[in-house]
Amino acid sequence: MHGSVTVDELALAEELAGSGITGAGRVASADAAEYAMRLGDDALVLAQQLGMWITRAPELEEDVALGNIGLDLIGHARSLLHYAGTATGRSEDDLAYWRGEPEFRNAWLFEQPNGDFAHTIARQLVASLYLYELYGALEESADETIAAIAAKSVKEVDYHRDHAVQWVLRLAGGTDESRRRMILAVTDTWPYVDELFVDDELVTRLAADGVAVLPSTLRPAFEAAVDAVFTEAGLERPTGRTAFIASGGGRAGRHTEHLGPLLAEMQVLARSHPGASW
Amino acid sequence: MTDPEIPVLTIEDLGVLRSASVDETGAVRVQLTPTYSGCPALDAMRDDVVLALTHAGYDDVSVELVLAPAWTTDWMSEAGKAKLRRYGIQAPTGRAAARDAGPVRVQLAVKCPRCDSLNTRELARFGSTSCKALYECRDCLEPFDYFKVL
């Protein structure tokens, strides 16, 4: 149980229509804001990617499923980025639309292209199994706002992981072609796993205060979950391959070539009409 | 006050209304909690609450949106579940608190809200809104929405 944390402090206040809402406004420390921005950017970039599947998924039900998962992730991103913005007086929209590539803090996994459906599912599997362990642990965060967002998000991510797991089983156990593609997708995705579990200076400092969780401590549970799925699917967990992460990687604002075009599409409308609102 | 997406359920049935109080000066304070993080119906619900209270003669109304504790379908009232079924949406089966936490999940049968048959199948886990899955009854052959346990 956590204290009563209002969404006004966390997110929706300015964006929700109507008025009469006042929030006490819990302000994030500089470190907590940076941490919330990492988590928020992971969710935002992944949501944007999933949105690209709408009208293009293999079946109508998947358009809806990926759209709904993206919507949950947008919800998480809004709460997290709003909280991150309290440290510097920026709104969630300022952070989403008016930062350039080097200011984004997402890990490389989330900006890897959708590829074919199997690649999207492999990315979803890694992302949702990781986020499930992360948010589960953050429910106990000493930062009440982060704990509240995590407790809300973990239940939704549980459905996302179920979705990914079911598809991994189906593709791996389907036709020769679907199995071939699933294996290739897992192989291509795995080099981006390591970055998720790096303990850098910021998380180490925040973990000492009980605000963050050390990513390395999540890895055994993540791998056990992956192994349970892969055993059922007859797949092997790739080992020994890791992406070359330029100094600091996504958490330090150094990104692969895929983030730029994604941001351009996401930000063009807001930047063409600065200050416009619904 | 009903849910804009499921007009047979009040926000109290749904568990979205967490508290409402009036102080001695006549100021009303209402607490709402979102169902899913990205649920767009929350904006509409908040506006509807302000409108309804204003029409009822209260001019000092504040609506607070609360994230913790996180909303769960366990809060849905029994009356609400019965109304849902009559409307053609199967209510959550089982309790969120008792969900199996393993990564490879066993699916429980969901009853058809029209003919009560357990001979149904899931067409899509993500249905018309975030909170629902789409099912089909193999006996009466009707499709129906199922309100997922969260």
Cite the ranges covered by each PLM segment:
Chain B
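AMP-binding/adenylate-forming catalytic domain of the ANL superfamily
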Residues: 63-69
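Short edge beta-strands and adjacent turn/loop segments
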Residues: 8-33
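Short secondary-structure junctions
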Residues: 1-14, 56-58, 114-119
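Cys/His-clustered metal-coordination modules, chiefly Zn-binding fingers
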Residues: 79-150
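A short linear hydrophobic-aromatic micro-motif
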Residues: 18-19, 62, 120-123
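Charged, alpha-helical interface segments at or near domain boundaries
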Residues: 72-76
